[in-house]
Amino acid sequence: MLRVFEAFAGYGSQRMALRNIGIDFEVVGISEIEGDVLQSYAAIHSDFLEKRQRIDDYVPEDNEEMISYLEEINVPLDYKTFENRAKKLKLPKLKDMYLANKLIKNYGDIQRIDPTILPDFDLFTYSFPCQDISVAGYQ
């Protein structure tokens, strides 16, 4: 089985491509910082929607623990100010964000990842930046 790390994962198009061509693989981790995209990834590629129905069974009671975890991986990130938005999330969204990141094994901001803590992988893949946030090309 191919062990995959998916950087700049977006909604998981690289994962979808591997599935579509019949590759036997396991995603051992991802790197993504956009909050809403992460929840989409979790809804598509995990049992996020099912677990969300009983979310209190899967998240800590302590809000600060959830915030600390999200700040540590720098999720969600505000692209205009490059500030972490975890403290600004209202409780339902904070719980959703925490659960989604845990389920999909998100290591968060690629600039902050300690490579020594990454799981072993055979394939490192990535997606290109979303056009609405890329600084490349005509401005």
List the predicted regions and their residue ranges.
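Conserved active-site and SAM-binding loop architecture
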Residues: 1-139
